């Protein structure tokens, strides 16, 4: 039984006993008859009548018995002189007793008072520590064998697993590395976008190696008061040394490992730097053969302090990116275990339709499809549920088919999405259209889904311009067919501006800054280029978008009849796949 459970049971037993005592005290009759209380004058009358048999005097109280056996008590007044003579004359058997208080009774109030004061002081300290985050939190390791995750549960990352297998082999067989004089890396940094499986990989290493696994977040080190984070780092590594060989995993290490020395940081600056300094010291403090492996994960390796990444600390840095088509298929097969799939469902086709999806996205995709299958009363997951789940992930919400839309607004959405689809289909280098719909979903009135035929790492200038043209196609179609623009292009313009700005300022595809890449900065108020250069970049971004918009408008005006046919078909059917779009535009 846990300590919290034991404490709760004890509390309830004490409450029941206290309730029974109150019940007996107030409602139940006494087990013995209480003596009758007599006044002093009544006692003297009984004494004169010789009805008193015996008397015991204790301090100022007389307890006695009548001749008939009735007990009584009398409180003696201060002027009760001569009482002994009267009792003797009446022939009453009398005794005198002196009440002696034990020493512990005299000391008990003082002890109780001190105990109450100490308890209140301890309670106040605990409350204060909890309020300011100062309570010590001992990190408990995951014992060997408790991690259910192994490399068999990690799919689509064969290269990354190959790098980590050396760490596992060292933890299992350190002697062969020591014999040859090899030094295993002290630290392993996993970096990549969210949802790619960095934490899963760390747990798989612990599960494969069968060693204790300490896991915590980088933000748990940074506290309000200076010194608390450094203290927690010392405590963590002290426990790690006691449990060696083991793995210490720090998730989101950028919360504590950011670059030092920026004056723009306000609040928590000294505490974070002291915590980072202590982490650096601890990683230098254990030897190459102590068996403590530090693993960390981050989405932003570019903001980490250089001292943290030097050889001897995190000297093995492993990128964990989104999987390719083959990796996505492997991940889908792992997450499909335990799910009832339709025999006709092709996971390879699903993998080809989901470029850029991470492992977390694919797991969520299959889970959403399973929920949709249950909602529709089906016993298997079909491609229909997969399509709907992909749309939910891409567009950010379920279809709002019951929403009432004005006919003119529905036509405008159809024109807008048809413009995207036409430009994407007729522009060389653009990603092919997979689906176009005017069914509202999330905050969008409709959307056009385009995906590359193959996974792509590099993009040329013409390919990026083709993407910009596709984004501007909806706005141009509205202006050509309907005569004016609407707010429906808000997200398209935001994305187009971002791509154009990156082309000019990061990829060397402009003239304003030439081949110089403008660095990013996370510090508020810190300028990374002059105002003149920033203005020149903005002017070139505007000129690029204006030129591409003119080309897109010219393309739409040339193919106006095709656009109208696509709008009519889309308005009637509401959803078209890529083959339908290409058939209509080729007619």
Curated annotation (Swiss-Prot):
Pfam families: AAA (PF00004), AAA_lid_3 (PF17862), FtsH_ext (PF06480), Peptidase_M41 (PF01434). Residues 34-102 are extracellular. Zn(2+) binds at residues 416, 420, 492. Residues 1-12, 124-587 are cytoplasmic. CDD domains: RecA-like_FtsH. The keyword Flavoprotein does not apply. The chain crosses the membrane at residues 13-33, 103-123. It is found in: Cell membrane. Keywords: ATP-binding, Cell membrane, Hydrolase, Membrane, Metal-binding, Metalloprotease, Nucleotide-binding, Protease, Transmembrane, Transmembrane helix, Zinc. Signal peptide: none annotated. GO terms for molecular function: ATP binding; ATP hydrolysis activity; ATP-dependent peptidase activity; metalloendopeptidase activity; zinc ion binding. It is a multi-pass membrane protein. ATP binds at residues 192-199. The keyword Transmembrane applies. PANTHER family: ATP-DEPENDENT ZINC METALLOPROTEASE YME1L1, METALLOPROTEASE M41 FTSH. Acts as a processive, ATP-dependent zinc metallopeptidase for both cytoplasmic and membrane proteins. Plays a role in the quality control of integral membrane proteins. HAMAP family: FtsH. In the central section; belongs to the AAA ATPase family. In the C-terminal section; belongs to the peptidase M41 family. Homohexamer. This is ATP-dependent zinc metalloprotease FtsH 2. It comes from Symbiobacterium thermophilum (strain DSM 24528 / JCM 14929 / IAM 14863 / T).
